Amino acid sequence: MTDSQHIENLTINVNLVRLPHLTDYLPNLQTHTTPLEHNNFYHPSNGFYLSQSDVIIRRTIYDLARTAPSSHFAYHRAGPRKQIFYDQQNVRAAIVTCGGLCPGLNTVIRELVVGLWEQYGVREIFGIKAGYRGFYSMDPVRLDVKMVHNWHKRGGTVLETSRGGFDLDKIVNAIQDYGYNQVYIIGGDGTLRGAVKIFNEIRRRKLYVGVAAIPKTVDNDVGIIDRSFGFQTAVEKAQQAISAAHVEAESAPNGIGLVKLMGRSTGHIALYATLSSRDVDCCLIPENEFYLHGKGGLFEFLEDRLKQNGHAVVVVAEGTGQDMIPRTNAEKQVSDESGNPVFLDVGVWLKSELKKWWDVDHKGELFTVKYIDPTYMIRAVTANATDNLYCTLLSHSAIHGVMAGYTGFVAGPINGNYAYIPMDEIADTKNVVDTKDPKWAWVRSITTQPDFQRN
């Protein structure tokens, strides 16, 4: 029997997700041949330029015994187009960072500037200070390649950032007043929801302004795309905290090292840090509820582990167990300027509960809990090599998309290839840990922790 006799042909339909374009409301825009054609650093070969027919399939894995792949959703592939909708001499680009810090922010800013400057010959590039409010309350900073040359070696964001300050009319009025015709927005889910409103208002006013977003969330909780920039750096840096907790726990009788990692609504950092470390005895994430007392609870598991090894390491994501922590009425109402509920410190609470448990069940026996919270250390570091490269590809993808006339989109990888995704589709998505996925099973097989499902 030949190999061909084992092949079964499948027919599928591809549904291309529509991407907003400037010509949707400005149909008479003139096109230009891309400056890349005459750029000394580029020698375009066959396949270098992409077209409308270049797409990326969103879903690539199927169980053919259960689901027939009758249709696929596809997105436009990111990359340079031969015909663009901007004259390089007339581009005025604005770049803004919003929300919390994340490794790689300065790399994204740098590469937006370098990409616009070196690839497309743009000279009017401006940085918006301190987030969305900077559009209307502060003077912009003129950027050039010399200024941003070493920014990728710095943590944080040189442009500064803040939460809140979103005033739609003031922001779009400022975009008009300053004459920006390209706006690059770097931020997380709250920022992306704001970007959708900015894009819709620009479209309503029929302004010649392309809007692109680069998703930023160290928690890796933005949906559709493979991952967010800064995530791999965060997992790498979390190893130091876990190693320190392990040393502390090993160095004391009945020692427990407790590490709180970032992850408001999802436990990706905790999960990947646990898999990478192999020093973790229990990983607690928001997607998998746990309980403290009784059969199959956390305390029973830790008691057995302390009897076996004399020490244990627990990693907990910051959004875990929030409904278990007592709150005052005032605490129940608190939100930050982005509208996110302010979480209580699960690490402080869990440390206290561990000590209460031990004092009741093992009064007089030695016991130590060392709590490590590396949150601000992790998010403030410079990006590692992998994230630096990733930020470069994201930035250049966004530039190529805006130059091609696309607008209201997010640049990001899908199945390892870069695509343009409509902002309104991605803004309200969440990438959460699937506790039925093999990766979570790997965590439990390594730690041997219970599933915390009450019988």
Where are these regions (language model features)?
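C-terminal non-catalytic interaction/assembly regions of soluble proteins
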Residues: 1-42, 330-455
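N-terminal phosphate-binding or glycine-rich loops at protein starts, especially the Walker A/P-loop
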Residues: 2-34, 82, 86-133
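Glycine-rich oxoanion-binding loops at beta->alpha junctions
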Residues: 52-87, 133-181, 218, 229-236, ...
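Gly-rich Lys/Arg/Thr-decorated short loops/hinges at beta-loop-alpha junctions or inter-strand turns
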Residues: 88-96, 131, 149-159, 216-226, ...
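Short glycine-rich or small-residue beta-strand-to-loop segments that form or flank ligand, phosphate
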Residues: 92-102, 157-160, 181-187, 213, ...
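Short glycine/serine/threonine-rich phosphate/pyrophosphate-binding segments
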Residues: 102-112, 135, 166-171, 189-197, ...
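Anionic-ligand anchoring segments at beta-strand to alpha-helix junctions in alpha/beta enzyme folds, i.e.
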Residues: 110-157, 364-369
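Accessory alpha-helical/coil subdomains and C-terminal extensions
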Residues: 174, 185-187, 193-208, 212, ...
